[in-house]
Amino acid sequence: MTDLAARLARPGPMTAVELRPPRRGLDTARSMDFWIDMYHAVQRFARQGTFVLLTDDAAGDAEEESLAHLAANLGDGSDFGTVVPFLTCKHPLEYCRMFARRAAALGTAGVAVVG
C-alpha cells in the first residue's frame, strides 16, 4: 500500500495541496520565477508530509509540462512520494503511457487520471 493509500484509509481529516504549473507563453523570467517558487513549495510540503496534487493542463489551460520540470530541477534525492501528478485523458494513449512510466520512475505517490 502506498503512503497515499494508507493515509486515505486512516480516519480523520487529511490536508493536500493542488499546484498548477505556469501557463505556456509566459516570458522567460516570469516562467523561471514561477518554477523556482513551485520547487520550493513542493520541497517544503514534502518535508511536512503534505501530499501535492500537481495538475498538468487539467483545468483546460495550456500549461507547461510539470513532471519534466520537477524531475529536472528538484534534484536527485528529492522525495516524490508525496507528489501526485494529474494526467488528463485528452492526451494520446502513448503520451499517457509514457507519463505514467516517468511518474513511476520518479517514485510519485500515484497518478490521478482525470477525464
What is the role of each PLM region?
Residues 2-115:
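Active-site beta->alpha loop and helix N-cap motifs at the rims of alpha/beta catalytic domains
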